[in-house]
Amino acid sequence: MAGRSDIRIAKNTVIIYVRMIVTILVGLVTSRLVLQALGASDVGIYSAVGSAVALVSIISGALTGTTVRFMNIEMGKPDGDLNRMFNVCHTTHLCGAALIFLILETLGIWYIHTQLNVPPGKAGDAMFVFQVSTVVACLNIANVPFQSLFNVHEKFGTIALVDIANTVVKLLLVLALCLFWRESPAGLRIYAVMMSAATWVSFLFYHLASRKYWPDTVRWHPVKGGSAYREVLSFSGYNLLFSSSMIARTQGSNMLINAFFSTTVNAAYFYASTLQNYVMNFVSNFDAASAPQLTQSIGAGDNGQGELLARRVCRVCLLLFLLLFFPLWSELDFLLRLWLGAGIPPDTVVMSRWSLLVAAVSVTSAGLFQLINAYGRIKWFKVESSTLFLLCLPAGYLLYRDGFPAYSILICFVVADILNRIIQFILLRALFRFDVGWFVKGAYLRPALIVLLMCVYIAAYRRLPLEGAWMHLAGFALTFLVCAALVWGIGLSRSERSRLLRHPRVVSFLKRSR
């Protein structure tokens, strides 16, 4: 069973990484074109207004995690009723979408009119972007139960095709923006409408495809009785608390930056966050590919298999992260200027470095997050995480009030994440008798040794006299090869290297390369 599970996870991972590579490459081009077409100020407005929407769309994140978890658990049960669980989640999402719409059209409009710091003459554009973003947020919430079906059935190929198609469409629309509406007074409004088009396409596709593939599951059948929703809503409540703290930490900090600094600093934070998201997506995709297997193992009562899988996922995610982190760190200044061009907002480089450090600490939760959700007893995990994340906002406010630079709040993120991981292990041991030493040794020890060796390498690398674009690109490639060699020789065990070398596709490739 473990072998079949590994094969399915590997297949899902390959599909997800193909999607990720395409979307990141296209996204990098799109980001640069948007900066050229709109300018740093309008990009900052779009980011700040989007933060206001994201801050109140925390319900979406909470309901998404709940839906995927309960559907996977239902799939793992021998007598699971997926149609009943789908209808419970669908009803909950529709109510959540209505609640978000009400919040956005009241408190959100108040924020835009009274608190948002925008250049003169741009208030109307900000309100237009806000209304478009409101519609997009509500559609995304209503779409979650249908998209979750593709996740629990491990139809990652379909999800990948939809995401790739959406990314390519966005690129084509941005090219049209550059050609026909570059530096146009209405450019920001046109861009907002263009970005909403992909959401409408996804919404229609997932609804129609779900009714084609799983008509019995999506068949509308009202589930009566409060008990049917109590467990889902209780789980959602704690996820809601956690999601609100995460959004407050990221998007709320964006609003804090807007209050103390200019919109160009918002743009720098936006691009640093974009880089962090790209790196985290590279890692979290493997985590996502393993989620159905891990959760269904716990649902079937096989806790040992679930914990073993969580430890393995954590180590592999850390190794994948290191393959990106050190090459990026070695040539970050050059790569950001290559990506964004001469119009790169000030402070982007320093914010990006701290964002990478935030990601480095965050990735240590890979596998653990899925395992905790699968266990189901999430109350204290969500409470402690949310408390630490929310404390970052007042800490950032105090730092900004005393004149500290914009990146100071990212330092708060790093400290909060370190404390969060320590408390998570304490809770896991207390609530589930989880063997923390076994997990730490198996998940963190090998990556930690690679980190030490790569830090020595980076210290020596900085002494090299690199001049010209090709020398910097060669240095980036060299750092990647050195890190990859350490991941292969130290990060993977002897049995893992042996299995990879014996894999039929690897053997076939080696024969053809001779």
Language-model segments: what does each one mean?
Residues 61-77, 152, 214-215, 272, ...:
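Helix-loop junctions and terminal segments of transmembrane helices
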Residues 1-9, 188, 204-250, 293, ...:
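Interhelical loop/hinge segments that connect adjacent transmembrane helices in multipass membrane
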Residues 1-27, 80-91, 126, 222-243, ...:
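N-terminal membrane topogenesis motif
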Residues 33-55, 82-85, 125, 188-193, ...:
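Interfacial/gating helices of multi-pass transporter permease domains
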Residues 19, 161-213, 273, 386-391, ...:
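Hydrophobic alpha-helical transmembrane segments
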Residues 11-28, 166, 191-210, 225-296, ...:
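Transmembrane helical elements of multi-pass membrane transporters/channels
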